[in-house]
């Protein structure tokens, strides 16, 4: 994994992610590099490589790092794009690794204008996915989304709209369950 301190093209990143297919040790090294290096460019490239791994490789080899990646994503002074790290977590989120702290972080920072729009939209997307595992949290997400009603940036508008679809479907399922009782 030399040259990760240099700026890589998308083609190079995709090629590196393909080289790592079914390489548990190599993927583990990339995860460790992303989480532990002080060099922002190396961490960014490592995160980008992890993002482009196949779904199978992520599930098998990146999932064990979920808690470390989640903790890292919630650091106040993250030295790479938070949205990129959150996009990795979105694909890894399951009912088994649900973290209330991460959900709360997403809600709190999704309305924080100090965060980039891409990070905020990824927080909304991740929170919506997490609500699928714990439907009782849909009302909290809806309250957060209400605060974003007048946001004008396309990424946040789209993330909000898609998250509201999740909230509405969860509410509909909840109403159907109540009617059966």
Regions found by a protein language model. Give the residues of each.
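Alpha-helical scaffold domains
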Residues: 1-181
